[in-house]
Amino acid sequence: MQARHPVQLVVEDDLHRSRLTVFFRLLLAIPHYIWIALWSVAVFFVSIVQWAYTLAAGHPAPALHRFMCSYIRYATHLEAYLHLVGNPYPGFTGEEGEYPIDLTLPPPGPQKRVVTFFRIFLALPALLLNTVLFGVPGGGFNARANSRGGNASFQGSSSSGLVTAAAFLGWFASLVQGRMPKGLRDAGAYGIGYGAQSLAYLLFVTDRYPYADPTSLLQAVEPPAVHPVHIVGDAGDLRRSRLTVFFRLPLWIPHFVWLVLWSIAALVAVFLQWWVTLFAGRPAAALHRFLSRYVRYALHNAAYLFLTANPFPGFDGAPGRYPLDLVLPEPGRQNRWKTFFRLFLAIPAAILSGALGGSLFAAAFLTWFVALVRGSAPEGLRNLSAYALRYAAQVNAYFYLLTDVYPHSSPLEGAESAPESEPTAEPQYAW
């Protein structure tokens, strides 16, 4: 784990949302569009002056540093409001402590001149990942069953990014419930926090590079309960073979062929399992074992392809044989209504999984270059990839009737609850 990043996200949101302001959120923000556009023009010119000053003095000018901090904090408040991560209407000055989604920013300090000189070029990878997390303008959503390779066999595709997809789904949920689902709020907060770190790096507030690890960015956020589908593995193993990294795609071809063939059989099996679960109220044990192996294999396969793990995976999806493994529940009773409407209920989760897929591709793309140079994967990118794979595995497990617990979209791993002496009601996850 790296040392604490100087730019930290503060989350003091209570999840309550006003239905009226949620419905008209984009219209209510029109004055802010104008203000941030004007402020951004000023920041462009001020950043040039700050670059020259920092290059000459070895540290940023205090007055310009305060100006940049106010701008970054204001942009964070506005993004949180627009993407339903926060509820109150934000102010226009970027004052610290005035909004439930806030930032702690470092005071001006020494910065390396060589890093300052090449800042715009060094920032490009972080800006690429930030763009993918927020999404491409004009992006859309769709969800489909997919029998090809990748991180989820039932997945969505989206050019709209994690933050935008979470806001899109959260908009409907907030109108119905008057509350933002915690998982979606956490996902949006993560993307906004990474964007703030990227902006702070670009505008010379700090020379510490943005850190993509979700756990680091959401330290102040309470983790959800442990989902019955979760990943396990050695968090400290970042070693990557340069040779297999370079030839990762050709090496993956046998797994691609096998995954396609297994996916066809899995679709037939889940069709039969749907009827069994609908009438018996629980899945057939033999089909459950077959589909569990398939879902676990899909995770191993994607972890290898996207450089989240290093060894070449096996072809059988057996538990305990891969560094990044998947814990799956035993067959148990499932709600018949959830079973009957499973395909439709899975669509929101598939949309979000598709949005996370863009981040997974970007993280793998950047990891490929770093791993070739260093022989190891960046911890932050590896943890972001693990988050995307974990959520995709939960979507798969839900679609393939391994559990009727809905996927939880929080980037945080679940927290272990206290031991229970008596069985309790199964936890309900709303995204």
Say what each PLM segment does.
Residues 1-431:
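Membrane-proximal intrinsically disordered regions of secretory-pathway and membrane-system proteins
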